[in-house]
Each structure stands twice: as C-alpha cells, then as structure tokens.
Design a protein with these regions (language model features):
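Mature, function-bearing regions of proteins
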Residues: 1-188
Length: 188
C-alpha cells in the first residue's frame, strides 16, 4: 500500500478526466454491468457467494461500492488512503474453495486487479452511452489515472495493462478465457 507521501500522486486531480467522467450520476446505470463482470471471475464469484451480503442487502452493497469510488476519487488523499487500507483489510480474510474445488483468496492479484478493471470499464462504457466521448489521449489519461487509483488498494502495476489499448485486449481476453457462467452471476 502507498505511503502518505505517495497518496497525493495517486488521487485524480480536480478537473481531471477521471474526476469529470466519474462524477456523472447517470453512470450508476453501469453498476450491474460491473458487478456481473466481477462475479463472473471464479475467485470473485466464490468470495461473493460465500461472504457478501449482496443477496440480502443489494442497495447496501451498491452504496459501499459508491463510497469506495467517490471517496477515492473526490475525498482527497487522506480519505482515499484510509479507504484503500480498509478495502484491503476487509478482503484479507475472504478465502475458501470455489465451485470447481479450487482454493481461492480475495487478494489473488489477478482477481483483485480484475475488480478494479471492471470499474474502469463500467465508467468508460456507461459514460460513452451517455455521450461522454473521449479522444484517444483522454482514454489513455483516464486509464493511467485509474491504474494509479488501483495502487490505493494494493493493485500492483504489473497486474494491469500499461496502456488503454492493452487494457482493451486484456479485457476481451479475460471475458473470453477466464470469466465463467455460474450461479452467483445469475443471482446478482
């Protein structure tokens, strides 16, 4: 996790691409998109099925995710750092055996990075649907800002693609080769 000195460099600046895009309340419409992509990952799906209260408190789950996104983007470095530590700590004890009989841990780098990546995709895709067109340079800036935000929760740079175009390839590969259709996907 980042030091206090590093926090200011990780939080998007006021008026940045991420700051402007993520502030559109209409992007809430992408929450289901992100959640479905997240839980389709076998590790995330197992953790959600075994530990999450989404089934009994879906609105609470949504609000906690919104608190995370809004707090890390708009809350300033100190709040963003505290949120990052809390998210990491909450996930530290989430582990078990998935539906395929394989052991999992919520902090597996691939799965943890995937959750972060789905939020970027949701913001981008939902924003695009509402007319937030971005130039190639803006997409790249957004992705670099989003990668830095990932460091707040301990997502390592090496677990996310370096550039937006690489992200698109990574995203398609994850959907094609890693995500699974299992009961948790249908429950959310």
């Amino acid at each position: 996790l980042p030091t206090e000195e590093e926090l200011a460099d990780l939080v998007p600046a006021k008026g940045s691409v991420t700051w402007r895009l993520a502030g559109d309340a209409r992007l809430l419409g992408g929450a289901g998109y992100a959640l479905a992509l997240q839980v389709a990952h076998p590790t995330v799906g197992a953790g959600v099925a075994q530990y999450s209260a989404f089934a009994v408190d879906p609105w609470g789950r949504l609000l906690r995710t919104l608190d995370y996104v809004n707090g890390t983007i708009y809350g300033g470095p100190k709040l963003a750092g505290a949120i990052g530590k809390r998210v990491r700590e909450v996930h530290r004890t989430i582990k078990g055996t998935n539906a395929d009989g394989e052991k999992y841990h919520a902090l597996e780098p691939e799965a943890f990075a995937w959750v972060h990546a789905t939020l970027a995709s949701s913001i981008f895709e939902t924003g695009r649907r509402f007319g937030h067109t971005m130039t190639r340079d803006e997409r790249e800036i957004f992705w670099q800002e989003w990668r830095r935000l990932g460091r707040l929760v301990g997502v390592r740079d090496r677990d996310l693609p370096e550039a937006w175009r690489s992200f698109e390839v990574y995203f398609d590969r994850m959907v094609r080769d890693t995500l699974q259709d299992h009961p948790t996907v249908h429950e959310v």
